[in-house]
């Protein structure tokens, strides 16, 4: 190493003057000149290391000298100087003085007619023949200054650089005058030093087992660490005070120099580029190669307290995403205008279910992830339902069992083709070990909040229920306002899904919108004869008026078998995404050859079957009727909107022998007019066998998360079990009379007060004396006390109030180290949290559900321990 380069290394990092024997070394091993240290003590009242902010307890004069520095200086003094380098190794003071004097306007001009020109040539050639002692730049143009505080200079002047304000401005000095000037007016001869690679702690990083984690570097929030190098994808090595160790990258925020160091991953060698960082990345044309080489050596070795750094000329970039295969569990609707986020979500893999992979469809207003049936709960803050999306017509028979087919026509098909036909039947009604899934509910009545965490309900407003608590309260998100809170469950009604008959083969369907809200299923059968499906259908003469059901509540018409060719299922553009999904599920389930464990509409002996007289769609639109035999096939059907106001949330409005934990609207069930045996008895055996088989296959090594609730009826009658996904399809037990409905009157004695409003239209009487008819109270006069929201109890995110027979495949883990999320797809872990892990990925990341808030996402497996 030649003498000039060695001298260039021996400079104070603060004032950039050459160090001498009076320089002091701090306890953190950083060395500074005595003048700078005294200045820091005088201005701050205390001495902290300018590099790492370590507090120094002793005085400046008590600090030791740097022995290595003293020896180097002695060696340089004793070493004979080469003849050709006399000009380049001139004393620090004289070189700087010469530059300043020349910049001031020629107080030391050489004699002769070309004195001014020779002076500038000498100043310009100084960095080439020797090494300048201060960062400097040469003026390319005249600059007169536009505002007070600007530095004026002429073309060819040498300006000492003090700092870079931003990518467009420098602060510099010329002739003792300080000021600002634009970067594009100068050419940097010697760049400013690279700022130290540092990072700021965003969280506390503590060590549980100091012996096992002895290589880690603990720190507290807001500490400033010096970054040394990147160890691997998630860890970096750094220094805090006199300690060196590794720390998680996600716990800190890097400055520009540290970000470049982390990106480079290892020091680069050689040098086509100069080693200055962002400070000189926009400083105009660079000097030639002979000028770059000394700068490289200087910056790569200047901070002798940590690893050498060499930076390339490029703007500071954020660290690239380290995980590309983000998985989003569902069901969740994710709306993002950020293409990066959309692309990351789009890379999600097959989810948790082995039965069917997830489908992702990008529509005009957002990205909709349609999960497989066994995906766990995921909370989402924004839900987008495309308002004017046109849904393609999809042949029912074109939807085979899993895997689901891709969309068949327009790119705007959202979720209609995404649902697969391979939905498994749920276990028997008594076996309740399901999980909660975000479900769309509609508010049946207005409700004014009485506490801060409650949401205001407006009639007809849609909510995504994320959690159903045991006390009957729901926790969810308003799809209109995006607010999250709790609200009484008995004020809500689910946006239901239709049920298919397990005893019927493939049946053509047509879904037509009623005012863009309700959906009616009818058969385009020739047996309907003169019935015009495009016109409102008349109601049976004896039909009693009923309430308007929520959006997408479906009433099922009996469909005769063996009479219809394949037809298309049409989903109107006014339907919400969930309605479209539900419609496809209905059509798909018709195409299955195996029983679906759903309520079975028994075929009528009449050539034309009817909707029951009490089945009503939104806005009381009339339902199918026929001129003959109307009274012979009527069945009294419980309406969820009426029952919701009359029953506690843990009692089903119409199926009191099941464990339905929320009020649900009922699907109309036409039955054989001459048959009095329980519904679905003929297919009970086959359904039960298939359920047992599915349950045994799914329950291997599974953890049941639910506590079963006692049934209100000791011995439910024989009936098909509920479809796991179809919360609306409650069976109608034979002769079910609802004395338990009176229980709802006692719900107002504690907890929150506020009567559930009722409408006289909700009143319904028994529709016939048929033994299969269901009678229940629905008139407000039948109750002695108004119905109030149920008393609030602590919600448990693990207790599912939904009747779903499939438990989550999961293991319990406890968070041992807090983890801050790096993206929306990741979970925020706090120490002590319980996480239910559903999937362990090969890259060491887990996917699971956080017990604290019910959110599902990704997190590193090293932050949790199995319980």
Curated annotation (Swiss-Prot):
Q: Name one GO cellular component term.
A: Golgi apparatus
Which residues belong to zinc fingers classed as RING-type? 12-53
GO annotation, biological process: negative regulation of apoptotic process; neuron migration; positive regulation of JNK cascade; positive regulation of proteasomal ubiquitin-dependent protein catabolic process; protein autoubiquitination; protein ubiquitination; regulation of CD4-positive, alpha-beta T cell differentiation; regulation of CD8-positive, alpha-beta T cell proliferation
The biased composition feature labelled Low complexity covers 275-285, 760-769
> Which InterPro entries does this entry report, sorted A to Z?
Endophilin_SH3RF, SH3-like_dom_sf, SH3_domain, SH3RF1/SH3RF3_SH3_4, SH3RF1_SH3_2, Znf-RING_euk, Znf_RING, Znf_RING/FYVE/PHD
Fill in the PTM field for this protein: Autoubiquitinated. Ubiquitinated by SH3RF2, leading to proteasome-mediated degradation.
Q: Which reaction does it catalyse?
A: S-ubiquitinyl-[E2 ubiquitin-conjugating enzyme]-L-cysteine + [acceptor protein]-L-lysine = [E2 ubiquitin-conjugating enzyme]-L-cysteine + N(6)-ubiquitinyl-[acceptor protein]-L-lysine
Q: What is its EC number?
A: 2.3.2.27
The biological pathway it contributes to is: Protein modification; protein ubiquitination
The GO molecular function terms of this record are: MAP-kinase scaffold activity; ubiquitin protein ligase activity; zinc ion binding
- Sequence ranges assigned to domain SH3 in this UniProt record: 132-191, 194-257, 436-497, 808-867
Instruction: Cite the record's Polar residues compositional bias ranges.
Output: 116-125, 770-784
**Keyword check for Cytoplasm:** yes
What's said on domains? The RING finger domain is required for ubiquitin ligase activity and autoubiquitination.
What is the role of this chain? Has E3 ubiquitin-protein ligase activity. In the absence of an external substrate, it can catalyze self-ubiquitination. Acts as a scaffold protein that contributes to the effective activation of the JNK signaling pathway.
What family name appears in the similarity comment?
Answer: Belongs to the SH3RF family.
Q: What name does UniProt use for this protein?
A: E3 ubiquitin-protein ligase SH3RF1
Species the sequence originates in:
Danio rerio
Q: State the gene name recorded for this protein.
A: sh3rf1
């Amino acid at each position: 190493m030649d003498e000039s380069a060695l001298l260039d290394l021996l400079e104070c990092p603060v004032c950039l003057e050459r160090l001498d024997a009076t320089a002091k070394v701090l306890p953190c091993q950083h060395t500074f000149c005595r003048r700078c240290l005294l200045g820091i003590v005088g201005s701050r009242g205390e001495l902290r290391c300018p590099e790492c902010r370590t507090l120094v307890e002793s005085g400046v004069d008590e600090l030791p000298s740097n022995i290595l520095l003293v020896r180097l200086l002695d060696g340089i003094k004793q070493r004979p100087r080469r003849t050709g380098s006399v000009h380049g190794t001139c004393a620090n003071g004289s070189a700087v003085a010469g530059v300043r004097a020349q910049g001031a306007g020629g107080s030391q001009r050489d004699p002769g007619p070309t004195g001014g020109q020779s002076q500038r040539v000498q100043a310009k050639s100084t960095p080439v023949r020797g090494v300048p002692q201060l960062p400097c730049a040469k003026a390319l143009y005249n600059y007169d200054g536009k505002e007070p505080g600007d530095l004026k200079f002429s073309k060819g002047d040498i300006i000492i650089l003090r700092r870079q304000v931003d990518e467009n401005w420098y602060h510099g000095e010329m002739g003792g005058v300080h000021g600002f000037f634009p970067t594009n007016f100068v050419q940097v001869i010697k760049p400013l030093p690279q700022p130290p690679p540092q990072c700021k702690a965003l969280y506390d990083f503590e060590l549980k087992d100091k012996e096992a984690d002895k290589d880690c570097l603990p720190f507290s929030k807001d500490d400033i660490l010096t970054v040394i190098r990147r160890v691997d994808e998630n860890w970096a090595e750094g220094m805090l005070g006199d300690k060196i160790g590794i720390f998680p990258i996600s716990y800190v925020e890097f400055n520009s120099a540290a970000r470049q160091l982390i990106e480079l991953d290892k020091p680069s060698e050689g040098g086509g580029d100069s080693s200055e960082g962002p400070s000189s990345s926009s400083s105009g044309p660079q000097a030639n190669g002979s000028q770059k080489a000394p700068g490289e050596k200087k910056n790569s070795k200047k901070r002798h307290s940590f690893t050498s750094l060499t930076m390339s000329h490029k703007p500071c970039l954020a660290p690239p995403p380290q995980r590309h295969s983000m998985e989003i569990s569902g069901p969740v609707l994710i709306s993002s205008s950020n293409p990066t986020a959309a692309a990351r979500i789009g890379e999600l893999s097959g989810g948790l279910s082995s039965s069917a992979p997830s489908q992702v469809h990008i529509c005009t207003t957002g990205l909709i992830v349609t999960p497989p049936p066994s995906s766990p709960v995921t909370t989402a803050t924004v839900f987008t339902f495309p308002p004017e999306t046109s849904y393609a017509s999809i042949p029912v028979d074109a939807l085979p069992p899993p895997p689901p087919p891709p969309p068949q026509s327009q790119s705007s098909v959202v979720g209609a083709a995404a649902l697969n036909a391979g939905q498994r039947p749920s276990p028997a009604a008594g076996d309740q070990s399901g999980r909660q899934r975000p479900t769309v509910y509609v508010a049946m009545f207005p409700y004014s909040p009485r506490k801060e965490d409650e949401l205001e309900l407006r009639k007809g407003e849609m909510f995504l229920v994320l959690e159903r608590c045991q006390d009957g309260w729901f926790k969810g998100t308003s799809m209109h306002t995006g607010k999250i809170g709790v609200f009484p469950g008995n004020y809500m009604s689910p946006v239901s899904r239709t049920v298919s008959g397990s005893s019927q083969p493939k049946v053509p369907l047509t879904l037509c919108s009623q005012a863009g809200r309700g959906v009616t299923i009818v058969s385009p059968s020739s047996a309907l004869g003169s019935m015009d499906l495009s016109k409102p259908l008349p109601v049976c003469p004896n039909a009693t008026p009923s309430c308007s059901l929520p959006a997408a509540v479906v009433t099922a018409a009996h469909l005769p078998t063996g009479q219809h060719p394949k037809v298309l299922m049409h989903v109107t553009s006014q339907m919400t995404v969930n309605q479209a999904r539900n419609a496809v599920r209905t059509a798909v389930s018709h195409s299955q050859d195996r029983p679906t464990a759903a309520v079975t509409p028994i075929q009528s002996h009449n050539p034309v079957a009817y909707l029951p007289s009490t089945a009503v769609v939104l806005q009381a639109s009339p339902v199918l009727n026929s001129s003959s035999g109307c009274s012979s096939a009527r069945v009294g059907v419980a309406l969820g909107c009426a029952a919701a106001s009359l029953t506690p949330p843990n009692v089903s409005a119409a199926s009191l022998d099941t464990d339905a934990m929320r009020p649900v609207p009922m699907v109309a069930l036409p039955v054989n007019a001459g048959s009095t045996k329980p519904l679905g008895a003929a297919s009970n055996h086959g359904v039960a066998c298939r359920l047992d088989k599915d349950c045994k296959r799914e329950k291997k090594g599974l953890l049941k998360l639910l506590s079963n609730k006692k049934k209100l009826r000791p011995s439910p009658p024989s009936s098909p079990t509920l479809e796991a996904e179809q919360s609306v399809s409650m069976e109608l037990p034979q002769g079910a009379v609802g004395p338990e409905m009176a229980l709802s009157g006692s719900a107002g004695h504690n907890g929150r007060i506020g009567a559930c409003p009722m409408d006289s239209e909700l009143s319904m009487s028994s529709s016939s004396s048929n033994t299969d008819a269901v009678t229940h109270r629905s008139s407000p006069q039948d109750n002695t006390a108004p119905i109030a929201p149920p008393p609030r109890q602590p919600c448990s995110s693990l207790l599912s109030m939904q009747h779903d027979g499939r438990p989550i495949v999961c293991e319990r883990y406890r968070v041992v180290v807090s983890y801050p999320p790096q993206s929306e797809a990741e979970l925020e872990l706090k120490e002590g949290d319980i996480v239910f892990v559903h999937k362990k990925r090969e890259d060491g990341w887990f996917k699971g559900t956080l017990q604290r808030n019910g959110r599902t996402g990704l997190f590193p497996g090293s932050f949790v321990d199995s319980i």
